[in-house]
């Protein structure tokens, strides 16, 4: 059993990017789908889909590369962990590399980027940073 499924997801994406894989497959969960949705909306991944039957569903993430073969994901960092949760208010949401990256926040209105949460006046659990 994985103690931190979100960190496992980020590690699989990071390893897939370093190995220049086109697709990364991992066990699916609703939170992982929300994270993949935000990363797709922001252009870090090309797409995602849930495959398989209910008990053993898999999340397939299609990684995105430019014409030169460079990945759109330069780095991923887990912030809030099971042993130390990190919660932020609206004004405490960090800017990632001056706006080149995103912070992903789990709010009462769902999982969204830090800038979306800031515009809506929301805080929440700071899940990770992607740049």
Curated annotation (Swiss-Prot):
Domain of life: Bacteria
Keyword hit for Transcription: no
GO biological process, any: translation
InterPro entries: Ribosomal_uS8, Ribosomal_uS8_sf
Gene Ontology CC: one annotated term: ribosome
Keywords recorded for this protein, A-Z: Ribonucleoprotein, Ribosomal protein, RNA-binding, rRNA-binding
Molecular-function GO terms, alphabetical: rRNA binding; structural constituent of ribosome
Disulfide bond entries: none
Family label: Belongs to the universal ribosomal protein uS8 family.
Subunit: Part of the 30S ribosomal subunit. Contacts proteins S5 and S12.
Function as written in the Swiss-Prot or TrEMBL entry: One of the primary rRNA binding proteins, it binds directly to 16S rRNA central domain where it helps coordinate assembly of the platform of the 30S subunit.
NCBIfam families assigned to the protein according to its UniProt record, in alphabetical order: PRK00136.1 (NF001109)
Protein name per its UniProtKB record: Small ribosomal subunit protein uS8
């Amino acid at each position: 059993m994985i103690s931190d499924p979100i960190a496992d997801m980020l590690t699989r994406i990071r390893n897939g990017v370093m190995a220049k894989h086109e697709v990364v497959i991992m066990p699916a969960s609703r939170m992982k789908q929300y994270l993949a949705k935000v990363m797709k909306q922001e252009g870090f991944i090309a797409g995602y889909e849930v495959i398989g039957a209910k008990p053993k569903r898999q999340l397939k993430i299609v990684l995105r590369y430019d014409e030169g073969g460079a990945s759109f994901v330069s780095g991923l960092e887990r912030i809030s962990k099971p042993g130390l949760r990190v919660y932020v208010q609206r004004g405490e949401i960090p800017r990632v590399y001056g706006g080149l990256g995103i912070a992903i926040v789990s709010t009462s209105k769902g999982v969204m980027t830090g800038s979306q949460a800031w515009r809506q006046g929301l805080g929440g659990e700071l899940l990770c940073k992607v740049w």
